Amino acid sequence: QELDLAVIGEKEILTAAGAASTQRIRETVENEFFLEFMKRLIRNKKTVYLLGQPADAVERLYSFLQDEYEKVKIVAQYAMETCIGDLDAVVNAINMETPDVIFSVLPSPYQEHFLEDNRGKLSARVWYGLGEHYAADEKGHSPLRWMRRIIRRKKLTNRLNEYNNNEK
């Protein structure tokens, strides 16, 4: 079954698919799509549901989103390992919250199978599979965190300069 839209998150996949233009690789390596997606998600006040396995992966995702995008509206989260019974209970839990977007950190291929089996039942318009490395570069540092620190330093410097100018 084909996806409506797939955003490639690894440059190796682009290369294998023969779509490794300089622009596409830059967009992939620098997470440009994700950054823009998050800006629009927050600006349009869209809601997010977190789904994953194991529970600590869901918690890490929650912490990451709260740290990096404090204005994001997370309506609920669900760790698949807590599911007792069939997966319809998970689908119902998601649909009860009526999220606009589901961020998934389910392992592959479990994520693909879950989505294929339940795609028609989910009310969310967007399923965003983040994978394992959504928050870190190769060295384990978040490029988003680094960028945010630079922006905050610049804002702090501007405020201090403004304060000093007002004091004179």
Name the predicted role of every residue range:
Residues 1-47:
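Electropositive, gly/pro-rich neighborhoods at or near active sites that engage anionic ligands
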Residues 12, 106-110, 133:
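Short glycine-rich anion-binding loops that position phosphate/pyrophosphate groups of nucleotides
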Residues 42-64:
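An alpha-beta-alpha
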Residues 62, 112-121:
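Short Gly/Thr/Asp-enriched flexible loops that form oxyanion-binding sites at enzyme active sites
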Residues 81-85, 123-156:
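Short, flexible loop segments at boundaries between secondary-structure elements
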Residues 94, 98-108, 124:
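Proline-aspartate-enriched helix->loop->beta-strand connector
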Residues 157-168:
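A charged, well-structured terminal subsegment
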